[in-house]
Curated annotation (Swiss-Prot):
Belongs to the TACO1 family. GO terms for cellular component: cytosol. This is Probable transcriptional regulatory protein Bcen2424_2294. It comes from the Bacteria. It holds the Pfam family TACO1_YebC_N. NCBIfam families: PRK00110.1 (NF001030), PRK12378.1 (NF009044), YebC/PmpR family DNA-binding transcriptional regulator (TIGR01033). The keyword Methyltransferase does not apply. It comes from Burkholderia cenocepacia (strain HI2424). GO terms for molecular function: DNA binding. The keyword Cytoplasm applies.
Amino acid sequence: MAGHSKWANIKHKKAAADAKRGKIWTRLIKEIQVAARLGGGDVNSNPRLRLAVDKAADANMPKDNVKRAIDRGVGGADGANYEEIRYEGYGISGAAIIVDTLTDNRTRTVAEVRHAFSKFGGNMGTDGSVAFMFDHVGQFLFAPGTSEDALMEAALEAGANDVNTNDDGSIEVLCDWQAFSAVKDALEAAGFKAELAEVTMKPQNEVEFTGDDAAKMQKLLDALENLDDVQDVYTNAVIVEE
């Protein structure tokens, strides 16, 4: 992507994630419970559970914690009343934002999400108001210096749809979200370990923010991320660090 470093953004994202690992574990436990409740406790026949368990491994969550979460989900304890709700809205300058939640109290959650938007210069939108600006995909990012030709060959053979080299030298691989686990396994078997591997809502176009606007936008994103019921926040805003 011209104008900003995809690699710097990913490193910042990983550092932020490491700083709040306890919160990430809490979110993953909820996701594992819900996935197991809806699709069963076998990762081989439950793609959503497989994805959640892989995320837990990447976050260094102990296997005992993962097993307990699966058992609770299958048994119907805890998590049984969690409801998946997506909220859409806008940040400053009309930046698009998607907020995915798992909640046992939608009245509380919508109030908290709306408050975060309004407090930091954004506003809630209606269902579908910004989702069309994103694609639901599997995304992998590899460090600058990775062999582009070898990675492209392995990725396309694994079932990826697209391979892009960014201006900073990092390489992005995209696939259908349903094929994420299969592509991830194939790439790792070929010797390619991604620095970032996730199923995400990828914006079709990005909007860069600098200076004061970047600081304001970051505050809004942080406020949404820090809500207990929020699982993921997606945006087409790119915060450019100067």
